[in-house]
Amino acid sequence: MHQFESKNRYFDELFSNPALMWLGQNTNHFDTHPQVLQAMTDSIHAQEYHAYAPPAGLEELRRLVLEDVGLSDASVLVTDGAVEGLYNVCRNLSGPGAEFVTTDPGWKWPIGFARASGACVIEIPIYDPKQGYRLTIAQLEAAVTERTRMIYLVDPNNPLGVCYTAAEIEAFAKIARRVGAYFVHDCTYFHFADHHTMAATFYPEKSVTIYSFSKWLGLAGLRIGAIIANADLIERLAAAPPNILGCNVVSQRAAVAGLKIKKDWFPDINRRQRRNQAEIVKAVKGVAGMKVAVYPSQANFLVVECIDAGITPEALVDAYRAENIMIRQGTYHTPTFGHRFVKVSTTVPEAWADAFCERLPAMVAKARGIKETAALF
């Protein structure tokens, strides 16, 4: 069987399980705000979906996104999820002979997009407690060359959950400007951070900000995101994007409603996921050989190290899956460091997080007896 078929069947089985507790994909499973639900049902009942939405997105949504990120002089291209935006950016702004610089670990798919464009990918290792599990200014300075076309930074980092300071972002932007590289700042998780700085503040001419509604608003299955950059860059990216006919209008109505209620609704979402983080840390401390790498995470997940417990991440994933709990093996993010950890999402009902915690000692014990697992994705 081809790998794409195996992968699809794997996720179809997970998706078709109504009892599954999703703690593996950083998705948000808290109840949707009533006004967001109403916006979607109103759009469906009005049968707006018969027509194509505006190609760059609803004007109201574009305005609200800019307000949310505080980049009033920028422009917005609404996309079918942040990942479509990343595909567009990597394929159009990179190319043969160019260097694409990113971190290891980080998010894997832009690496694939850059390679498909012909770029040479340079991954800078950051999985090291001695440097706080973060990219250093010296590392980036040493990695870039005159061939560097793109610097891609997930901030907060997925999977580690570290968030960069304003001084670090400013220094990274200066390095990008010096070599003439695009700074692709993937801010998918910035809403969860205590403090966050947009690279475009320092480098508006060649910064590209990636925005998502999947994680903070819980719209992963609706596929809605955005690219934010100066108007000249958006003009280039809007010329031939993967979708030229406008994004899902129902999704856009949900996003508009979400941004309007965000100030009143989201603080409690973040409080609840931080509560889940604290409970997971407490549970992990009670199991010999297990530890959380970064706490508090500035995103909605935790890296839980299991290498010193004498188990593989895959075995632990397999053990939990039998309990209808999905967590993610580290190799999804990084072949180099993935053998060390699993990732556990925290924007989930408290009962789900508690179920993970209560079962942890038994799952670790069970994982020690699991020597082989089926393919995981």
Locations of the language-model features?
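PLP-dependent aminotransferase-like
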Residues: 92-153
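Active-site phosphate-binding strand-loop segment of PLP-dependent enzymes
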Residues: 127-194
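Conserved core segment of the aminotransferase class I/II
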Residues: 205-274, 281-282, 318, 365, ...
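Short, conserved charged micro-motifs
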Residues: 310-316, 351-355
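PLP-dependent enzyme catalytic core of the Aspartate aminotransferase-like
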Residues: 322-328, 333-377
